Structure formats: structure tokens, C-alpha cells
Amino acid sequence: MYKAITEDDRRQAIIQKMIFQEIRRLDQSALMSLLKNKEGRWFLMRMLDATGINSNSFTGNSTTFFNEGKRQVGLELLGRISELGIDAVKLKQKAELEYIEHQLRARELAVEYTDKKEGSIE
């Protein structure tokens, strides 16, 4: 912990700690609100996808560093969800299931559409 040299330093350290705690509280509240909302869960999953969290980041060139930076953002977000506790983790899992279901349904619709198009050409 930071040890104050002067009274002003001590006061500044207390102020910084209080600001940090308030920002953390607001971040946690916002993240939980996001997880409790279906559209928020969708957005969360889109952002996690954008970070490449479940992808191989190695390219064999300097793009690897960029990809790892994006991936680190996703890992940070997952860590913050875990810090919120079991309810947040369950909501994240719900988001993952909703996301997979949506992707499967979109694929089904695309296959149906292309099958109809191919059938109408004949």
C-alpha cells in the first residue's frame, strides 16, 4: 500500500482510492445491467467475438501482437464478469447459449433461402 510522506500526500491517496472505488462500483453495476438485458447479452457476445477471444491469435508476423491485444481486452472483460460472482457467470453462460442459438437459426434461414432460390431456378 502507498505510504504517505506528507498530510497532502495522504489526503491525495485517500481521494484517489475513493475515486477508484466509485468507478469500480459503477463499472460493476453497468456490467450486471448489461448481463440482465437480452440486448445487452447480445452486445457482450458480439464484443467478445470482436476480441477474438476464442480464436487463434498467431499469424506468424506482427499482426499477432495486435490480435493478442484485442484478445486481452476480452480476457479482461471475462475476468470482470467472474468477479461479479455466480449470478453474473450464469448470465454470461445464458448469453453464450442465446448467441449460439441465434447463429444456428440464422444458418437454418440461410440454408432455407438458398434452397428455395436453387429450386426456383429449375
Question: How should each PLM-predicted stretch be described?
Answer:
Residues 1-122:
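Intrinsic-disorder/low-complexity detector
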